[in-house]
Design a protein with these regions (language model features):
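Mature extracytoplasmic enzyme cores
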Residues: 1-254
Length: 254
C-alpha cells in the first residue's frame, strides 16, 4: 500500500510515504514540518435492519411509510470469464449487504459507513506538503476525514501537536455495537463531530506527544469514538521510555 517517495519541484520539497492516487506525500516531512500517523480506531460503521415490502422487494419501511431503494447496477469483471452484472439497492442508511426474503416479514441488512458519505482527505495531503509551521498543519488537517488517523506533527520552531483526524459519527442513540432497527428513525446519524471538538493537543506540558492506536479521549469526552482500542502495552512502554531521566538523542532513537 505504502510507497516511499521524494517530491521536488520549484514550490515543493517533501519526502515520506504515499499511496497510489494521493496528491503528494501522505505522511513525512518537508523543510519546515514533519507529521506521522497511527490509527484512531474510530467506529464509523453501523448496521441497520430494514423491513422490506413483501409486495415489492425494492421498497423498505421508514417511519411508517414505504420508501423506494435507489437501484445501482455494477459490473464485476472476472479474468477469463464473462462479466457479471449485479444490482445493489441503496437505502437512506446505505447499501443492502444481504437480505432475507423468506416468510411474510422479509428483512435486509444495510450498512452505514462514513466512506460512503463523499468525505475525503486529498486536500489535506496537498496542504500538508506545503505547510511551514504547526498552525498551517492544523489548518490542513481540517480536511483530513478518512481514513481515521491520529496525526502527530512538529515544526522547526520547536512546536508540536496532535489531532484526531476522523469522521466521528454523532449518533442519535446507541453506539453502533449491534445492528439497529432502520425503520424507526431513532438511530440516525446527525452528522460528524466538528474538527475543533475532536481530541487534540498543541504544545502539551510534558513536552512530547505519543500515540499507539490507544484510547485517545478521557471518560468525560462527550462523543462516542470507539470500543475497539488496541491494548495499552505499547503506549505504556512509550511513556516509560520518554519519561526516563536520561537524555534522549537522535542516535538513541535510531
Amino acid at each position: 500500500v505504502w510507497w516511499e517517495a521524494h517530491l521536488v519541484c520549484p514550490t515543493l520539497n517533501v519526502s515520506g510515504f504515499t499511496m497510489a492516487g494521493a496528491p503528494g506525500i501522505a505522511l513525512g516531512h518537508n523543510r519546515h514540518v514533519a507529521w506521522g500517523v497511527t490509527n484512531v480506531m474510530v467506529d464509523d460503521v453501523d448496521f441497520f435492519i430494514e423491513k422490506i415490502n413483501p409486495d415489492n422487494p425494492r421498497q423498505y419501511l421508514y417511519q411508517g411509510r414505504w420508501e423506494d431503494m435507489q437501484i445501482v447496477e455494477e459490473t464485476i469483471r472476472i479474468k477469463g470469464k464473462d462479466p457479471v452484472k449485479i444490482e445493489i439497492g441503496l437505502t437512506r442508511h446505505g447499501p443492502i449487504l444481504e437480505d432475507n426474503n423468506k416468510g411474510t416479514e422479509p428483512t435486509a441488512m444495510a450498512v452505514k459507513w462514513a466512506f460512503t458519505d463523499g468525505l475525503q482527505s486529498a486536500k489535506a495531503f496537498y496542504l500538508l506538503n506545503k505547510a511551514t509551521n504547526t498552525h498551517e498543519v492544523a489548518l490542513a488537517l481540517k480536511y483530513w476525514e478518512l481514513p481515521g488517523q491520529n496525526v502527530v506533527f512538529a515544526d522547526t520552531g520547536g512546536n508540536i501537536g496532535y489531532w484526531c483526524c476522523a469522521a466521528v459519527p454523532i449518533r442519535s442513540r446507541g453506539d453502533g455495537l449491534l445492528p439497529v432497527p432502520g425503520w424507526s428513525g431513532e438511530y440516525e446519524w446527525k452528522g460528524y463531530v466538528p474538527f475543533e471538538m475532536r481530541p487534540h493537543l498543541i504544545n502539551p506540558e510534558p513536552g512530547y506527544i505519543a500515540t499507539a492506536n490507544n484510547k485517545v479521549a478521557s471518560g468525560n469526552y462527550p462523543h462516542f469514538i470507539s470500543h475497539y482500542w488496541e491494548p495499552v502495552d505499547r503506549i505504556t512502554r512509550i511513556h516509560q521510555l520518554l519519561n526516563t531521566s536520561q537524555k534522549l538523542s537522535v542516535d538513541k532513537f535510531k
